[in-house]
């Protein structure tokens, strides 16, 4: 349809600002940056659209839509090298747009030699009315990833519409704040320039996941998108070394979430370990269908060879080169089955020794109330029961309280409570995982074959027993350079007579001490309040 031979060009689908001067400046940066990588823009094509079906807000913000055809350079011998070159050029372009204060003037809807993303701020049934390309009978494809869903957590816009360049997402990422913080730290690991970021501000949780999947696809040694999604969304209570190895380097992106993807080589989906988003599939002799709901496609029942449900922590991949449908776990794939994955972890003994020492005199120091003890702590410690005191808190915010409050009362978790189904304590054991690894976090962008991870300790819960804490403290004196698991204790208390000035000074010193400890090769930091008393 477009007049180019297969695999000779890539198509960049661009959303551009309607302000002409800013649009021309952004396109100039785009062309020059891509040309510096040997990626010459052959021509631009105005995407034919029919805006009559758009709503008022969508019509007010509709961007200029252009497709740029980019020639594959001769030095890009493989499609993977071509894809990596395109990704690197895109990242540098975004960096330069940021420096020129033009970051909102150009958005890469898609950039690939295999896929083109058509998305709009419109109802799904009106997509082919808006994009006239989708009405053209010459426009054929072997596969399609179609997304229809409104945004629940962010104000929607044209760039936030789905799918993104690699993935489509149904659900939420409730760990997104931590995921974004780790992404920021990884920018230092990969030696990114000051303004080159793995995931930028002002985008949705789905957009952040897409950018991380892209980064891992084109910067790391992880071979396939299905592997990347399995690493980002591992099954609960996994015991095989593949997941242990990668879980040390990548924190989970927890949903509830159903993630679909398409890169032109494979198309597939993965359900996160909570399993709270429906996913139904059906296979006929000629087609494979997957959707959030059964009945989305009008399939004659007699033509269905097999059908089923995608379960929590599982995925499916369709190989577009041969049509094979694979439900196997990526840890058992041909690339990974015989590969050595040594997580280099050792379990800390969880046995709790008899403790004679009492800490009743500390209750007042830490502002524990009788309700905290009788309704929360004692029932949980003695019988493992749910804390009945957690059902609502009508007390005023700690920062506004005239009473002395616990330090922990000043912090709250932010998550999408309204949209999440309930999780009972029985099912919780099956679909959640509390494992924590203590030690140096490996760089997921380093080739795993060349640089084995430093040793670490594995614990089954983020709550450590006193015996486990004593074990970690014992490593301070016994650790050697060969162990590479070297704890460091930072005292977090300060003289109460120094008041607010002392508090601020201590916070600054804690940060400085933590940085210096890491520079001195310590791999576990213990923030200790054991010296807390009436004076500190």
Predicted feature locations:
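Conserved short alpha-helical segments that host acidic/polar catalytic motifs at enzyme active sites
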Residues: 1-450, 465, 477-483
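Short acidic loop-to-helix transition motifs that present clustered carboxylates
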Residues: 150-152, 495-496, 532
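Phosphate/ATP-binding catalytic cores across multiple sugar-kinase/actin-like superfamilies
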Residues: 252, 505-521
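C-terminal accessory domains/tails appended to large, multi-domain proteins
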Residues: 468-471
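Structural preference for beta-strand elements that scaffold enzyme active sites
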Residues: 487-489, 524
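Active-site mouth loops of central-metabolism enzymes
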Residues: 490-511
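Conserved structured catalytic cores and adjacent interaction surfaces
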Residues: 499-502, 517-536
């Amino acid at each position: 349809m477009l007049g180019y031979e297969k695999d000779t060009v890539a198509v960049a689908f661009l959303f551009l600002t309607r302000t002409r001067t800013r649009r021309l400046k952004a396109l100039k940066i785009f062309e020059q940056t891509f040309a510096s990588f040997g990626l010459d823009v052959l021509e631009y094509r105005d995407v034919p659209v029919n805006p009559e079906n758009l709503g008022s807000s969508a019509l007010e913000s509709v961007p200029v839509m252009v497709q740029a055809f980019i020639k594959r350079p001769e030095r890009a011998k493989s499609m993977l090298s071509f894809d990596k070159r395109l990704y690197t050029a895109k990242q540098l372009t975004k960096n330069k747009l940021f420096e020129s204060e033009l970051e909102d003037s150009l958005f890469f809807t898609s950039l690939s030699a295999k896929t083109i993303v058509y998305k709009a701020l419109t109802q799904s049934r009106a997509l082919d009315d808006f994009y006239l390309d989708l009405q053209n009978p010459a426009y054929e494809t072997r596969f399609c990833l179609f997304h229809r869903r409104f945004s629940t957590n962010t104000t929607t816009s044209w760039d936030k519409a789905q799918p993104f360049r690699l993935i489509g997402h149904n659900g939420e990422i409730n760990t997104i704040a931590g995921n974004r913080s780790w992404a920021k730290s990884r920018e230092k690991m990969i030696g990114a320039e000051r303004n080159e970021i793995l995931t930028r501000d002002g985008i949705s949780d789905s957009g952040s996941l897409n950018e991380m999947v892209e980064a891992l696809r084109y910067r790391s040694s992880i071979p396939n998108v299905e592997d990347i999604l399995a690493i980002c969304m591992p099954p609960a209570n996994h015991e095989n070394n593949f997941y242990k190895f990668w879980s040390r380097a990548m924190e989970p992106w927890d949903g509830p979430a159903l993630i679909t993807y398409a890169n032109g080589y494979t198309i597939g989906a993965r359900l996160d370990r909570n399993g709270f988003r429906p996913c139904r599939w059906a296979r006929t002799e000629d087609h494979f269908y997957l959707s959030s709901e059964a009945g989305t496609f009008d399939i004659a029942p007699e033509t269905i060879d097999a059908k089923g449900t995608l379960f929590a922590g599982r995925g499916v991949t369709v190989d577009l080169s041969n049509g094979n449908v694979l439900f196997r776990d990526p840890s058992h794939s041909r690339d990974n089955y015989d590969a050595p994955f040594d997580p280099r972890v050792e379990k800390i003994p969880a046995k709790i020794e008899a403790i004679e020492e009492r800490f009743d005199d500390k209750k007042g120091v830490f502002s524990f109330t009788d309700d905290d003890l009788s309704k929360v702590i004692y029932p949980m410690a003695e019988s493992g029961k749910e804390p009945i005191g957690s059902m609502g808190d009508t007390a005023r915010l700690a920062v506004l309280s005239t009473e002395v409050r616990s330090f922990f009362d000043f912090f709250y978790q932010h998550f999408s409570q309204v949209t999440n189904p309930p999780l009972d304590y029985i099912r919780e054991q099956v679909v959640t995982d509390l494992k924590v690894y203590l030690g140096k976090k490996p760089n997921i962008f380093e080739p795993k074959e060349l640089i084995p991870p430093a040793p670490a300790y594995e614990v089954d819960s983020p709550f450590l027993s006193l015996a486990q804490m004593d074990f970690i403290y014992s490593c301070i004196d016994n650790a050697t350079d060969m162990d590479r698991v070297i704890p460091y204790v930072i005292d977090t208390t300060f003289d109460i007579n120094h008041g607010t000035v002392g508090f601020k000074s201590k916070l600054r010193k804690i940060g400085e001490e933590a940085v210096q400890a890491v520079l001195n090769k310590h791999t576990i930091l213990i923030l200790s309040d054991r010296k807390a008393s009436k004076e500190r």
